[in-house]
A protein has these predicted regions:
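Aromatic- and Gly/Pro-enriched helix-to-coil junctions and flexible linker segments
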Residues: 1-223, 293, 313-444, 452, ...
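Short, solvent-exposed loop/turn elements at beta->coil junctions and helix N-caps
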Residues: 64, 232-233
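Sequence context surrounding c-type heme c attachment/ligation sites in exported
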Residues: 14, 31-38, 186, 225, ...
Length: 563
């Protein structure tokens, strides 16, 4: 009433003389385009004309207390109390105390309960309500024909004992908790592989009728209820740690690349606080993150006091990414079994590597067959020299022969697919080499004859096809056995070349009949089958406090994420 520089803003009982009302009626207030309706303006006028009364006396000065006593008495902040059941005159028995409250309200409106629904409708209502599914015909018939006085109670018990009950009603809490199977925050939306365990925990809690206070405690502090270290966990310990997945349902981009880590961490904390308060307090506190809440009695100081409770487990300056927060469910026995199997895996892997090395050596030999004789040994040495130790000449030589340079464990599949063509090439080389060797034996023998006339005569006979030679020519050649050399007798005159041709032909046969790809795949399947025996390692997506960790508490200012 004292007012400011312009005097009192309200003239009690006289709106027409009130500075505040005149400003509102003229449209000067509220500012900009937030104009009040005629009805709202009339309400203000009546309030001033009727004395401008307030719920409580206005203080002479504003205290440091941010919230009034009236705000602190808001109904949602009051402890739960057991109400007296209203006494209501009823002509029929009521089945639940809740019915008395309902009937009392109905009577205040001059209403009453409708007639009791027939059993066919009751079982449908119950089934849809508790399971979200309609009853089948057998269940309906059984309930309708059940003459027991507690038939309804029996039906309720049967539906509550159904696994579908937890699935039906657990999903409502999962919605409140913001359950998600992926991290969100980024477009990658990384999968949360182990989030389902928290979902199953909630469903099981409903099905086992877990007390609500225990349900809340385990979700907020399951790690504090579990003895460290988190090894060889018993079923109860697993349950409590799994329950803390409640505090891990907020979007978390800290495990993704390309994000501002400080922003992502603080957003994850803020979203977790939002999940906790909206579900357990029934109110949003996000406004108090940057300033005192404008509508609810939540100060910015209170917000960061609440955040400080979470700081040991969610320390933005010593952050743990989603993968770092996982708790392994591997037992000591699992580790022993895994180690034993991994020894077998390594043995099978070593055996496969021996086969790979054998195929690499074989493929190198086959490719060297196709190279000129004078380059065979240089190419072999160049290939067998490690890349970092090769000379420039060796590197250049291999570059000119890519089919040798590219031989590796990874490329054996390609060489295996081409084995038919490669074996034909090797066979052709062996054939040509054999013919050249036979011709060489004959040529060297003729050159060794001293009598030129004999040499000339024998050369002329050789020009005649063997099937067209006469007896005289055959007798003449019979006296000079080297000139009758064939593939079968080549070893008598050039053993080294005959052996080489035989090796080439054997290599061609092996190349044609050896499927390196299949052999390596079969060995890999053996390795995979052994590795599949390793017990699968499951994890708990939990929120835990690092041991001996006491972070500092910060009061952030708007937009400040890093100081």
């Amino acid at each position: 009433k004292k007012g400011g520089d312009s005097g009192p803003s309200i003239a009690t009982g006289m709106a027409v003389d009130s500075f505040l009302f005149n400003r509102v009626e003229s449209g000067e207030m509220p500012p900009e385009d937030k104009n009040l309706s005629r009805l709202e303006i009339e309400t203000i006028r009546k309030w001033i004309d009727q004395g401008a009364r307030t719920a409580s006396p206005e203080p002479d000065s504003i205290s440091e207390q941010y919230f009034t006593n009236e705000e602190s008495q808001f109904w949602a902040f009051q402890p739960i109390v057991k109400r007296e059941i209203p006494i209501t005159d009823t002509r029929r028995a009521l089945s639940s105390p809740v019915d008395y409250f309902i009937l009392s309200k109905l009577r205040s409106k001059r209403l009453d309960f409708t007639e009791r629904a027939p059993r066919e409708i009751l079982i449908r209502r119950l089934s849809f309500d508790l399971l979200g599914l309609p009853p089948n015909s057998e269940a309906i018939e059984q309930f309708v024909n059940n003459e027991s006085p507690d038939a309804y109670e029996q039906l309720v018990d049967r539906l509550l004992a159904s696994p579908e009950y937890g699935e039906r009603w657990g999903r409502h809490w999962l919605d409140v908790a913001g359950y998600a199977d992926s991290e969100g925050y980024t477009d990658a939306d990384t999968e949360r592989e182990w989030a389902y365990a928290y979902r199953d925990y909630v469903i099981r809690a409903f099905n086992e009728n877990m007390p609500y206070d225990q349900f809340v405690r385990e979700q907020l502090a399951g790690d504090e209820l579990t003895q460290r270290p988190y090894n060889n966990l018993a079923e109860e310990a697993r349950r409590k740690l799994t329950a803390t997945g409640f505090m891990r349902m907020a979007p978390d981009g800290t495990g993704s690349g390309g994000v501002d880590q400080m922003v992502a961490r603080n957003e994850a904390i803020a979203d977790s606080i939002n999940v906790m308060t909206t579900s357990l307090l029934g109110m949003t506190v996000g406004c108090a993150r940057c300033h005192n809440h404008r509508y609810d009695p939540i100060s910015q100081e209170d917000y960061y006091r609440l955040r400080a409770i979470l700081a040991p487990a969610m320390d933005w300056q010593s952050w743990q990414t989603p993968s770092q927060r996982q708790i392994s469910l591997y037992t000591e026995q699992d580790n022993i079994e895994k180690s034993t199997i991994e020894v077998r895996v390594q043995e099978a892997t070593d055996e496969r590597q021996k086969v790979i090395d054998k195929h690499i050596d074989r493929t190198l030999y086959e490719e060297l067959i196709k190279a000129p004789d004078e380059l065979k040994e240089p190419l072999r040495k160049a290939y067998q020299t490690t890349a970092s130790e090769r000379s420039e000449e060796q590197t250049a030589l291999l570059k000119e022969h890519p089919y040798i340079q590219n031989i590796s464990a990874g490329s054996l599949y390609l060489y295996s697919r081409q084995r038919s063509r490669r074996s034909d090439d090797i066979e052709a080389i062996a054939e040509q080499r054999e013919q050249d060797a036979i011709a060489g034996v004959k040529q060297r023998y003729l050159e060794g004859l001293e009598d030129e006339a004999v040499r000339t005569a024998l050369a002329q006979v050789l020009e005649v096809a063997s099937e067209q030679r006469n007896e005289e020519q055959k007798l003449r050649l019979a006296k000079h056995q080297p000139l009758l050399v064939t593939a079968d007798t080549l070893s008598q005159f050039n053993a080294e070349e005959a052996r080489l041709v035989a090796d080439y032909r054997k290599a061609a046969e092996i190349c044609r009949n050896t499927d390196a790809r299949k052999e390596m795949d079969d060995l890999q399947k053996v390795i995979d089958s052994i590795r599949a025996e390793i017990p699968r390692e499951y994890f708990i997506r939990a929120l835990t406090e690092p041991e001996n960790h006491q972070p500092l508490t910060y009061l952030f200012k708007r937009g400040n994420h890093s100081s």
